A protein has these predicted regions:
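Extracytoplasmic soluble-region selector
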Residues: 1-233
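Feature marking well-ordered beta-strand scaffolds used for ligand recognition
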Residues: 130, 177-182, 193, 199, ...
Length: 617
């Protein structure tokens, strides 16, 4: 028996569970749970969000306000109400939209429970006498984004810049590759589907003829746009498969051989919930890939495997070691047929290493899901830690880190993505053309592996940020962070859980104002790891196989619904660890092929075929 006293500090209101576990000398344990109810703090203030203080008659203006409590927490659970002191001049509906009726001065009051805030507003006579609308293109594909140009004009034909404009669209979907007189016998009478923003950006999900309408100040104008199928579908063909029957497969890496193995290609895969094995493969002839060596360490799971850019050093992670000293293992992979252990490194990494990354003689290793350590491996036999990066938010945790051009991108669940300078080359030393411009490199130059410097971050409102990949669009002037979800929900009446979520495209072109603009989400299952090459996303989708997605051009709306999915494939094997099922973990494009690790059955190599378009989704 014993007593342990703890102090708990609450950072959010709601139900809180505290679990205590006591382990016995023979490996058993007992546990108990205490449920606490943390009440909401009193409300403190209401803040208008970028409000319009000058408005025009005949317009509708949206207002937004945020409520904060005494703990300075944003309270999205509190309902706010808007009103004016003169409904004859301007009046709100219940959604926070203000209708301006006549010129004058009035006061807007926003209230929540026992607090309120006021805003003085002036309405002016509306000078708009007409409205024009034009489209930059008459015909686009599904998924293509266009910006409509709406111009409110005064009596002299001069543009009025600060008048609000609302946009809408209508149309009928056409499910055919061929339009005859802008109609098709395959049309089934469904309405056309797409997205239009408050700025007039439009993207279609279904083919058809769309009528886009702009409205302002009692005037309206229309533009018509024909939308045709995107036609990017291709087929996936199996090139080779290496079956793993004994254990669940985790992640993979592929690389080119060096030294006497120059001209050959190799891969490594880990194992999960097994006995600490990593398999090395010769994939020079991918149709006859074979395991050529095995490394076994004290671990239940070798979750992550990485190879250095020069093809000489390998890193495998360890979780579930018998002595609880996990850490990572440094390997000499110069001869993949005879891989040797150079060093076991577990200094302050005993909580388990889930993911690692190698960049320029340093390993970025996750430590117990709380931080990443930066470890110098310039001499692989004598590694040493040079720094760590850890968030300071309550209850923080980390799942992954990726390093590119000296910028580290970490995925931190609810805290989202953190972008850190660990030795970035300032952009002025590189090409600044749109195919290579990363705005974070324009901010780089102060950080190093021994002195990581945070550049930016964006939280994840869903709390599911599991993996992040930086994407410099090769066909637009955009820089995106592609943030992958990982979460599972229970199936009613069953103990089974099914993965959910997808990929969120965060436009970081303006690093001070990142915006989520698009999402790719498959209806039947959730995402895992992903990779980008050119303007194509390759994704592992657990039970949904691998997915290949066209991410060219500006990205807006529901990418799955827009027919951007190029192909998908489910690798099933009757001799796998789990027979005739698929569960894709990671995917890497390499030398024109797509390699992926299936949790249930091993390593695959596939390729895209049929260059000619086959139609839409």
């Amino acid at each position: 028996t014993g007593v342990s006293e703890i102090t708990v500090q609450a950072y959010k209101s709601g139900k809180l569970s505290i679990r205590a576990i006591a382990r016995g000398l023979k490996g058993g344990f007992v546990s108990g749970v205490l449920e606490l109810d943390v009440p909401n703090p009193p409300l403190d203030r209401i803040v208008f969000v970028d409000p319009d203080k000058k408005v025009y008659t005949g317009t509708n203006v949206s207002y937004e306000a945020q409520v904060f409590d005494k703990a300075n927490l944003l309270r999205e659970d509190v309902e706010v109400n808007f009103s004016t002191n003169n409904n004859k001049t301007a009046e709100f509906d219940r959604f926070g939209n203000l209708t301006v009726k006549k010129p004058g001065k009035f006061v807007i009051t926003v209230s929540a429970e026992d607090i309120d805030e006021e805003l003085k507003v002036q309405s002016k006579k509306n000078p708009v006498k007409s409205l024009t609308l034009s489209s930059p293109k008459n015909e686009i594909r599904t998924g293509d984004v266009i910006k409509l140009d709406a111009s409110p004009l005064d009596s002299r034909g001069r543009a009025v810049k600060d008048v609000p404009i609302s946009y809408s669209y209508s149309g009928q979907a056409v499910y055919s590759d061929v339009f005859i007189n802008n109609k098709s016998s395959e049309s089934v009478g469904l309405p056309a589907s797409g997205t239009i923003t408050n700025e007039g950006k439009f993207v279609a999900e279904t083919p058809g003829v769309y009528t886009i309408t702009a409205q302002s100040s009692g005037y309206s104008a229309i533009a018509k746009v024909k939308v045709v199928p995107r036609n990017v579908k291709r087929r996936i063909e199996v090139v080779g498969h290496g079956t793993v029957t004994d254990h669940h497969t985790s992640d993979l890496w592929v690389w080119a051989g060096v030294g006497k193995h120059k001209g050959k290609d190799f891969a490594v895969t880990g194992t999960h919930s097994a006995d600490g094995e990593a398999y090395f493969w010769d994939i020079t002839n991918p149709s006859k890939m074979t395991i050529i060596d095995t490394i076994k360490v004290d671990a239940r799971t070798v979750n992550d495997v990485k190879i250095s850019e020069d093809g000489r050093v390998g890193i495998i992670s360890r979780e579930g070691a018998s002595n609880r000293k996990n850490g990572l293992v440094i390997l000499d992979v110069t001869d993949p047929y005879n891989v040797t252990i150079t060093k076991m490194y577990d200094d302050d990494l005993t909580g388990g290493v889930h993911n690692v990354f190698i960049y320029q003689d340093h390993v970025y290793a996750l430590s117990a899901g709380t931080r990443y350590d930066i470890i110098n491996i310039s001499d692989p036999a004598n590694p040493f830690r040079v720094s760590s990066y850890e968030l300071d938010t309550p209850g923080h945790s980390i799942h992954d880190v990726w390093v590119e051009n000296g910028i580290a991108y970490s995925s931190n669940w609810a805290d989202g993505v953190h972008i850190v300078d660990v030795g970035g080359i300032p952009q002025r030393e590189q090409s600044r053309d749109k195919s290579s411009f990363n705005p974070f490199l324009a901010m780089a130059g102060k950080g190093s592996p021994g002195n990581p410097v945070k550049l930016a971050s964006k939280s994840d409102p869903n709390g599911h940020n599991h993996a992040t990949f930086p994407f410099v669009s090769q066909s637009s002037d955009r820089f995106y962070m592609i943030n992958g979800d990982e979460w599972a929900k229970s199936i009613p009446g069953s103990a089974e859980r099914i993965y959910q979520g997808g990929f969120h495209f965060i436009d970081f072109t303006d690093v001070n104002n990142p915006q989520e603009t698009a999402i790719y989400q498959v209806p039947e299952v959730g995402s895992h790891n992903h990779w980008v090459e050119g303007d194509i996303l390759y994704a592992g989708y657990y039970y949904g196989g691998i997915r290949v997605l066209d991410i060219s051009g500006e990205l807006l709306g529901d990418l799955y619904a827009q027919g951007r999915e190029i192909a998908f494939f489910e690798g099933r094997d009757p001799n796998g660890k789990i027979a005739n099922e698929t569960n894709v973990w990671g995917v890497i494009p390499y030398k024109g092929l797509i390699y992926f690790a299936d949790h249930y059955n091993g390593l695959w190599a596939v390729k895209l075929v049929d260059e000619e378009p086959l139609g839409t989704n």
